Curated annotation (Swiss-Prot):
Protein name: 5'-nucleotidase SurE 2
Family note: Belongs to the SurE nucleotidase family.
Pfam families: SurE (PF01975)
Organism per entry: Chlamydia caviae (strain ATCC VR-813 / DSM 19441 / 03DC25 / GPIC) (Chlamydophila caviae)
InterPro entries recorded: SurE, SurE-like_Pase/nucleotidase, SurE-like_sf
Amino acid sequence: MSELSEQCEKRLKILLTNDDGIFAPGMTLLVSNLLKADFADLYIVAPKTEQSAKSMAMTFHEPVILQPYDYPLPVAGAWSVSGTPVDCVRIALAYLFKDELPDLVLSGINRGSNAGRHVFYSGTLGAAIESTLCGVPAVALSQEGNFSFFQEKNFDIPEMLKSLSLYALSLPFAPHPVALNVNFPASNERWKGMRFVTTGPEYSCGVPHFLFCDGDSKIFKLSGGPKIVEEIPSEEWQTLRASYIAVSPVMATTSPLATFSLEEFEQLQVGFYDFANSLGMEN
C-alpha cells in the first residue's frame, strides 16, 4: 500500500496557524471548511495579534506567552501565542505536540496574495517553511483581494482542501523539504481550476511613505505600492489573472544548487494534474 493510500485511510492530525491572528476571518473559513470535510483532528496555534510580513522572524529578547484560546468552532484544541508565526510553529512542534507531531501544517488563509517575491516576506509562508524544516509537511494558503473564493459554490471547497492536504503529504520530502504555496485568485469570473507553476518575480510591498516630522524624527509607513510586473509576466502571474489557483513548490534550503531539474519539476506537474483531474478541475 502506498504512503498516500495509508494517509487516505487514517484520520489526520493537522496543525493550523497563520500570520493574520487567531481571530482572523481567514482562519475561521479554513476551520469551517475543514470541519465539513471531516478527515482530520484540528489544532490551532496562532498569533494573538496581527503578524503580517514577519517572514521567519522569531522572538528572542522577551518571553513568549502561550495561552489556551476558546475558539468558537469545535476544534480539538486552540492556543494563542504572543509572538510570530514561526514562534507558533516552533512552540507547537517542540512543546505541545513533541510526543506526537501533526501529519501536516496548514498556514492561512491569508488575506492577500503571497505570490511572487512576497514569499520572502510573508509570515504565512514563514510558518509553512519552518514546519518543513522541522520535518512536518506544510501548505501555505492565501486569497488575493478577498475571500470570495470560499463563498463560491461551483465546486466542493471542503473536498478540495482535503484532497490538497493529502496531495501535500505525497510530495517528496528528501533531500530538501518542499512546502506548497497556494494562491487563490481575485476575479469576478468563475474559478476555472488549478495550475502547478514556478514562483514568479512580481511584487508590491514595502514602499516607504513619508507621513510627517516629529522634531528631528521623520515618520514613515511601509505599505503596498503598485504591482511590479516583468515585461513578460510569469506563469504564476498569468495563472492568477486567468482565474486559476496557482500552486507553487517552495524549497526550504540554503543551497543555490538545490533546485528541481526540469525533468523533476515536470514529474511533479504530472502528479499534480492527476490530482487536479481527480477533482474534476481544469488545468
